[in-house]
Structure formats: structure tokens, C-alpha cells
């Protein structure tokens, strides 16, 4: 599996050398994250934002990476920027990730609202549905 990620890094770097796009930097960031290289992943997302500040994915991804590092307060503005981004289709992701932040901060009502909002946008999003069910079990 590691070889696949190493090869993906090479291919994304080659693509970026020929034609740097926000998407390619974001995908390279995902690959770095899968390798456990979170600082490199965040750096690639920042490069993506420099190229296209309207592209929402890298904002959400930085927020998600910060959540994994348990840097919850730092994640919030990144996720809010993802929600506000002009060019971002899977808007349910930042709402779900904000819900994760507020759940970790023990702000359960706010977390519930955000998980519901994620499901309003994408009713088939299993992770948000599971998070909402887990939250209901915690409260009851």
C-alpha cells in the first residue's frame, strides 16, 4: 500500500510541475495525509488556496487534519471558510467536521445541529447519520 502512495505522490508532483492546479495540490495533500505526513498535507492545501481561494476542498481538509491533531479551535475557521467557499460541491463535509469539533468540545446541541445540517445537504451521508445516532445514545 505504501508503494501506491509513493507512486501517487510522484504522479501528483509531475502533474503539478506541468500544470499546477488547486485540485492537484489538494489531492497531493490527501496522499500525504494518508502517509501520516500531516504538515506536508496542510502545506499542499495552503498552496491550493493560493492558486484558487474560492476552492472549498482544501479549507475543509485543513480543518479535518487539525481535528485529527485535536487542535479543535484552530479547525473551526477553516471549516467555516469551506462552508462559505464559492466553489465547493460536497458542502456536507465541513458541516459534519464542525459537528465533530463541537462534539469533542462537549457542545452537544451544536454538534447535533451540524450533523443534521450535513444530513439535510446529503441524506445518504452515513458518517453523519452514525454520528447523530451515537450522539442520541450519549444523551439518552
PLM feature segments, named:
Residues 1-23, 27-30, 34:
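Alpha-helical segment of the N-proximal tetratricopeptide repeat
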Residues 2-11, 35-47, 69-84, 105-117, ...:
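Structural signature of tandem alpha-helical TPR/SEL1-like repeats
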Residues 17-18, 51, 85-87, 121:
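Structural marker of alpha-solenoid helical repeat scaffolds
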Residues 24-25, 58, 92-94, 128:
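TPR alpha-solenoid repeat register
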